[in-house]
């Protein structure tokens, strides 16, 4: 059978991501400001978004390529002219453009350099701390230089080319040729789909060949060494029952005995003592030695909370960015935290940073790595609060956090929140269970995941919209039932009971949320409350048992009914 084939050759620079489209729509080669040659970066399943640079015999990767593909523990601080790597016990600092590590260890190569705003790191420096393979292929003819990377452990299939055959850009004879593979060339199978197979060569070519042109499939196992077992964790020998204690001034510390008077089964308390006070890494503190002494006398561990939103304004966000992205300031923050741990005899620390965006996530993770080293040395617990796993919070990288932290706390509430366009539960059981299971999938260790649960709920007020009259809350358009205004108020368990008791209504069980629910009319409005009570709390504790979690955390102490501890206690006695 005659097969019409395309004999055209693809522009390999374009194919490997070494060109860009200029303002006139023309493909233009990337250029660099420094000396050296641009090289394509062949990842395990495609070409990297960032090119590499070859200087003489030395090969350099964009640090973003390293972080995204090889190891997230590399970090660049352009402000202080540093490239760093942090493991379980130490941070290795190098000056950009230098050859020395931690000012004591000399190398025979330049470790890193800047090209414009981009940082490039020598593959030898990366290889010093991380087990992976690389191969440097020099440019030849129309083929650009390539840095070929292998970094994932596991099994992959290899096959042999039966006879000379063109590798193509896509799975069809009409697509352009990448290169010609010679008979008996060994290739790694990247993707199998019908008549065509995507393959990669040891020298960094990737593309499609007819499946019938391959033979002798064999499985090759790669096992790169990992240092994950060097990350020891400070863990409690019992299920954790943690209560956050909102402290907004020094006087509030005096209420400790009142706030824990009716608790049963509580074994950790987390006072919200610390927040960033400036852009230098200093802390605003409401810490109290007397508070810690009393808590310890009651058998409670104290994990003081540090947040980055203490002033709840634009300044707080700026503090977070400026402190975390500057190594000098970030280290000052770590030092201040550890000083407070020592001075107040704290058992651990709870990090609750919520002003983290994608631009500073690498700096936040570096902060956690650096803090974890000091906590590990001191034998103090490091717990980190996180939003419920979702596409919007994915960049927080719970998987990497769990490597360095002792416990990951998932704040499984605010499913519906102030400003929501829909009334609903603060934390339905389906929402909670998904949050827990997703967190376990990311951490791979349920025994270090703590589920944060609400001790509060919301009273939702729905008011029909009338012409010319503006209501309170969010305006919601509803073509079926009529437009309305929706507002809500956070309320305690006792307040919720007071409201529905005064309205002379009784709760009914809502199968959808797994909670008791009340609804009643108040004037022109409808009030709806998904209750937090013994039913919902028990269900969440059952989820803790089902998934074998490390424990639970309650936001916040003082919002619960006294009797709720009778429900909690059996799980922790």
What are these regions, as identified by a protein language model?
Residues 222-227, 311-312, 319, 457-540, ...:
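Glycan-binding loop/region signatures in secreted carbohydrate-active enzymes
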Residues 269, 351, 408, 451, ...:
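Conserved, mostly hydrophobic/aromatic
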Residues 221-331, 336:
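Glycan-recognition patch characteristic of GH18 chitinases/ENGases
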Residues 1-193, 223-231, 235:
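Primary recognition of N-terminal secretory signal peptides and signal-anchoring hydrophobic helices
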Residues 279-286, 335, 358-496:
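Substrate-binding surface in catalytic domains of secreted glycosidases
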Residues 184, 196-201, 209:
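SH3/SH3-like beta-barrel fold
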Residues 248-264, 327-342, 390-398, 532-545:
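Short, acidic/polar
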Residues 536-573:
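Acidic/aromatic/glycine-rich contiguous surface patches that form carbohydrate-binding/processing clefts
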């Amino acid at each position: 059978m005659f097969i019409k084939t395309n004999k055209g050759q693809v522009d390999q620079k374009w194919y490997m991501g070494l060109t860009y489209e200029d303002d006139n729509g023309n493909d233009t080669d990337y250029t660099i400001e420094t000396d050296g040659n641009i090289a394509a970066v062949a990842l395990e399943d495609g070409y990297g978004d960032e090119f590499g640079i070859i200087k003489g015999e030395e090969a350099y990767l964009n640090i973003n390529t390293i972080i995204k593909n090889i190891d997230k523990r590399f970090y660049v601080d352009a402000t202080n002219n540093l490239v760093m790597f942090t493991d379980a016990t130490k941070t290795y600092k190098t000056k950009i453009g230098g050859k020395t590590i931690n000012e004591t260890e000399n190398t025979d190569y330049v470790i890193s350099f800047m090209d414009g705003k981009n940082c490039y790191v020598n593959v030898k420096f990366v290889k010093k701390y991380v087990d992976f393979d690389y191969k440097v292929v020099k440019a030849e003819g129309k083929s650009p230089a390539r840095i070929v990377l292998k970094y994932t452990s596991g099994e992959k299939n290899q096959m042999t080319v039966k006879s000379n055959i063109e590798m193509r850009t896509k799975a069809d004879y009409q697509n352009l040729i990448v290169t010609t593979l010679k008979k008996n060339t060994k290739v790694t199978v990247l993707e199998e789909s019908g008549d065509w197979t995507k393959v990669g060569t040891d020298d960094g070519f990737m593309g499609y060949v007819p499946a019938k042109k391959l033979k002798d499939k064999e499985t090759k196992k790669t096992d790169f060494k990992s240092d994950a077992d060097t990350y020891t964790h400070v863990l409690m020998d019992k299920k954790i029952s943690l209560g956050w204690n909102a402290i907004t001034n020094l006087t509030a510390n005096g209420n400790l005995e009142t706030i824990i008077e009716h608790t049963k089964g509580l074994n950790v308390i987390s006072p919200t003592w610390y927040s960033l006070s400036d852009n230098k890494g200093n802390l605003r503190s409401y810490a109290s030695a007397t508070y810690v002494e009393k808590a310890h006398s009651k058998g409670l561990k104290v994990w003081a909370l540090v947040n980055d939103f203490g002033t709840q304004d634009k300044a707080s966000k700026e503090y977070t960015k400026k402190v975390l992205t500057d190594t000098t300031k970030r280290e000052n923050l770590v030092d201040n935290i550890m000083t407070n741990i020592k001075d107040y005899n704290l058992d651990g620390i709870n990090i609750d940073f919520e002003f983290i965006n994608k631009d500073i996530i690498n700096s936040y993770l570096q902060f956690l790595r650096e803090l974890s080293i000091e906590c590990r040395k001191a034998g103090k617990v490091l717990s980190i609060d996180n939003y419920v796993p979702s596409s919007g919070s994915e960049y927080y990288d719970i998987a990497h956090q769990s490597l360095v932290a002792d416990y990951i706390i998932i704040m499984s509430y605010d499913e519906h929140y102030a400003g929501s366009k829909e009334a609903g539960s603060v934390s339905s059981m389906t929402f909670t269970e998904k949050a827990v299971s997703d967190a376990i999938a990311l951490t791979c260790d349920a025994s270090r995941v703590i589920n944060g649960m609400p001790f509060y709920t919301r009273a939702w007020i729905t008011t029909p919209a009338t012409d010319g009259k503006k209501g309170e809350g969010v305006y919601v358009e509803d073509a079926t039932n009529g437009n309305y205004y929706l507002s809500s108020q956070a309320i305690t368990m006792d307040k919720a009971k007071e409201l529905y008791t005064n309205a002379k209504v009784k709760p009914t069980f809502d199968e959808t949320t797994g909670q008791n629910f009340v609804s009643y009319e108040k004037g022109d409005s409808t009030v709806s409350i998904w209750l937090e009570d013994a039913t919902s709390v028990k269900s969440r504790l059952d989820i803790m048992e089902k998934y074998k979690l490390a424990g639970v955390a309650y936001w916040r102490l003082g919002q619960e009914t006294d009797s709720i501890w009778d429900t909690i206690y059996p799980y922790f006695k």
